[in-house]
Amino acid sequence: MPALNRLLLLSNSRNAGQGYLEHARDAFRDFLGTEVSRVLFIPYAGIRISHDDYAASARAAFEAAGYGLDAVHDAEDAGRAVDEAEAIAVGGGNTFHLLKTMAEQGLLPRIRARVEAGMPYIGWSAGANVACPTICTTNDMPISEPPSFEALGLIPFQINPHYTDAHPPGHQGETRSDRIAEFCTVNPAVPVAGLPEGTWVRVEGDRLSYVGHAPARVFRGTEAPVDVEPGDGLQFLMDGGR
């Protein structure tokens, strides 16, 4: 992957008992530092919330961390806003609708180029999904049809956010692990990292660290899943998955 990529990819936006993005406030400060003063927010994954209301929630969270926030839907030229942004934050919601809207506005190649040149990228849930090669490991229903499942490709592996393998007694449907295993059976060369809520990955160039309170679960081909504790144990995902 390009050596300048800087990514902070979160599983979720809210932990139980905490405010919106409160659990990531210190991570935002550590990641963005003092070189960034404002971030550009992309609210297109929001479905049952207006872009304005979504941006207001994100703005309050980033201001609490010490950063201003501008929303891409308020810009006269969304592409130019991306080109001039100091950092980008992509919110969660429906991944299919997010990717469709980003594609329609021509933002995918512009975001990719900026991130590969060193612009910080923050994404949570759907915003983490679109940083992957494809959106094929999202948990969302396909309520909108993007032109392709191909996404930004900022990392060489897939993420499944909100990962849990809970299986209520008596429930006969597939578990999350079952669904991810289906993806890996069809795409054996592409590893998937299941990120429990309250966790995230941080990418600095070709280095990756995993932060949180619980192990990530990694799926590869038909191999048995492997749990990886927080730290640098997921680095192999940046090194070809082995």
Model-derived regions, located:
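Portal/gating segments that form or line small-molecule/metal binding sites
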Residues: L40-A103
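Alpha-helix C-terminal capping/helix-to-coil transition sites in glycosyltransferase folds
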Residues: D83-E84, A117, L154
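Catalytic-core regions built around general acid/base machinery
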Residues: E104-G118
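C-terminal and late-domain segments of enzyme folds
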Residues: P2-T34, I49-A56, A60, T137, ...
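Short glycine-rich anion-binding loops that position phosphate/pyrophosphate groups of nucleotides
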Residues: S13, I47, G93-F96, G127, ...
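Structural motif
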Residues: L8-L9, A87-G91, I122, I159
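Catalytic nucleophile loop
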Residues: A89-G92, R114-T134
